[in-house]
């Protein structure tokens, strides 16, 4: 068994590594602010929530180990909190105003559950990834600021008015075809830039896509992002929020690459067209069920290596027809558009279209053409009014395969039922069975 120390260091960065990342943040700032600004009049009452002030003795005892790396970062008290936008798995986001410049920014408070031990790996990955991936269609990190006792850390980002998930929940009509094309071009441009820089996002979904009043799409929330290499390494398969998770991940593959992001792009494409999630599963196995019913049951012929996937070795699936997805869209999608959709949702990851080729697809060149982003209509910014609730969207994965939770379709004829057979096998009738 690993020692407590080894378990801790497996997910934490030490002070010198934090210093290196923060140095890159400061290099991107136009003006370097030296030292913490603790002097002056008391902060306004509506500054961002923070911890009570500590005495000098308590401060010495409580300061986290990464303290030296944060010297030179501004204090969060230099920002006025306007409202809380939303809370996710990896942090809380506020809309705030810089008291010095009056600029409106987004502040993401990182979740630091073990901050006295070191800097969380997910937080350092998120900062590092965004800094490496500067692009017009990716959120911009401006700087890092800290709480008054150096016990809370915030990422300062450019404020963006909407996320697509919340926006679509308030829209009375879906996006026009030309608007969908514009959004998809921007999404593919951002994803291409990530993949060109050897970065997997691993949590692409509509709630992580931001939209400015000027019609510019920004890919956000890099809490699950990581760099990848060639040859592929074994990664955890429990990534990507369930509704947007590629079939190879659902079936337990540990070696995966950019294709898992491209499946998510296909799911987003369908959601932009219909304002509804394409495959809204309630568990891993319900998600597989929904995909197979629309696209058909895969085989070794169309997906080389399929029979060797961990879940496939433990389950057998009934043959469902291929491919029923076209009727989901009707007149919303042209033949070229459906061809692109099929390329995003190709079972075999090695044949799934990449972002670069997606941008070259004929769908974006047929009428109606993509519109200029500046021609997008404007909508009231929900993030300026209240804490945004994510509705029924599932949370990002936190670990484990949810085979014990079954969705609505589980009790329908087209779903599956867990029963015990005479030979001791567990059957998921009528379309799959578990093998032991």
Curated annotation (Swiss-Prot):
Topological type in the membrane: Peripheral membrane protein
Residue segments, region Calmodulin-binding: 30-44
Modified residues annotated as Phosphotyrosine in this record: 235
Binding site for ATP: 85-93, 108
Major subcellular site: cytoplasm
BP terms from Gene Ontology: blastocyst development; negative regulation of apoptotic signaling pathway; regulation of cell cycle; regulation of cell growth; regulation of mitotic nuclear division; regulation of mRNA processing
S-S bonds: none
Domain Protein kinase: 79-364
Location of region: Disordered: 383-406
Keywords: ATP-binding, Cell cycle, Cytoplasm, Isopeptide bond, Kinase, Membrane, Nucleotide-binding, Nucleus, Phosphoprotein, Serine/threonine-protein kinase, Transferase, Ubl conjugation
Catalytic activity: L-seryl-[protein] + ATP = O-phospho-L-seryl-[protein] + ADP + H(+); L-threonyl-[protein] + ATP = O-phospho-L-threonyl-[protein] + ADP + H(+)
Keyword Membrane applies: yes
E.C. numbers: 2.7.11.22
Function noted in UniProt: Plays multiple roles in cell cycle progression, cytokinesis and apoptosis. Involved in pre-mRNA splicing in a kinase activity-dependent manner. May act as a negative regulator of normal cell cycle progression.
Binding partners and assembly: May interact PAK1 and RANBP9. p110C interacts with RNPS1. Interacts with CCND3. Interacts with CCNL1 and CCNL2. Forms complexes with pre-mRNA-splicing factors, including at least SRSF1, SRSF2 AND SRSF7/SLU7.
PANTHER family attached to this UniProt entry: CELL DIVISION PROTEIN KINASE, CYCLIN-DEPENDENT KINASE 11A-RELATED
Family: Belongs to the protein kinase superfamily. CMGC Ser/Thr protein kinase family. CDC2/CDKX subfamily.
Protein name per the record: Cyclin-dependent kinase 11B
Encoding gene, per UniProt annotation: Cdk11b
């Amino acid at each position: 068994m690993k020692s407590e120390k080894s378990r801790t260091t497996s997910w934490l960065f030490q002070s010198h590594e934090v210093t290196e990342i923060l140095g890159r943040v400061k290099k991107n700032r136009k003006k370097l602010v030296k030292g913490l600004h603790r002097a002056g009049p008391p902060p306004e009452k509506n500054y961002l929530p923070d911890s009570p002030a500590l005495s000098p003795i308590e401060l010495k005892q409580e300061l986290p180990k990464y303290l030296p790396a944060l010297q030179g970062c501004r204090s969060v008290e230099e920002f006025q909190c306007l409202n809380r936008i939303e809370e996710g798995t990896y942090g809380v986001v506020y809309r705030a105003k810089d008291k010095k410049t009056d600029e409106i920014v987004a502040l993401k408070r990182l979740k630091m559950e073990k901050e006295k031990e070191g800097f969380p790996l997910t937080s350092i990955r998120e900062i590092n990834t965004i800094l490496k991936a500067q692009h017009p269609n990716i959120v911009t990190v401006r700087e890092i600021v800290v709480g008054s006792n150096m016990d809370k850390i915030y990422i300062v980002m450019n404020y963006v008015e909407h996320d697509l998930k919340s926006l679509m929940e308030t829209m009375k009509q879906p996006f026009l075809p030309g608007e969908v094309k514009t959004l998809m071009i921007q999404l593919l441009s951002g994803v291409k830039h990530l993949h060109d820089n050897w970065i997997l996002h691993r949590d692409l979904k509509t709630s992580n896509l931001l939209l400015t009043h000027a019609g510019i799409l920004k890919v956000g929330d890099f809490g699950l992002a990581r760099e990848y290499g060639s040859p592929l390494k074994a990664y955890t398969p429990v990534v990507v929020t369930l509704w947007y998770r590629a079939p190879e991940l659902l079936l337990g593959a540990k070696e995966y690459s950019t294709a898992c992001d491209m499946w998510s792009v296909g799911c987003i494409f369908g959601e932009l067209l219909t304002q509804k999630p394409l495959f809204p599963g309630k568990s891993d196995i319900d998600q597989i069920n929904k995909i197979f019913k629309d696209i058909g049951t895969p085989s070794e012929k169309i997906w080389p290596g399929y029979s060797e996937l961990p879940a496939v070795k433990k389950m057998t699936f009934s043959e469902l027809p291929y491919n029923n997805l076209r009727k989901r869209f009707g007149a919303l999608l042209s033949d070229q558009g459906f061809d692109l959709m099929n390329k995003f949702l190709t079972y075999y990851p090695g044949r799934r279209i990449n972002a670069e080729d997606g941008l070259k697809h004929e769908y974006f060149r047929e009428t109606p053409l993509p519109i200029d982003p500046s021609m997008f209509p404007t909508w009231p910014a929900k993030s300026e009014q209240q804490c945004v609730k994510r509705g029924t969207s599932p949370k990002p994965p936190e670990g484990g395969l949810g085979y014990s939770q079954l969705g609505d379709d589980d009790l329908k004829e087209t779903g599956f039922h867990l029963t015990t057979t005479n030979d001791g096998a567990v059957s998921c009738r009528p379309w799959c069975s578990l093998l032991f």
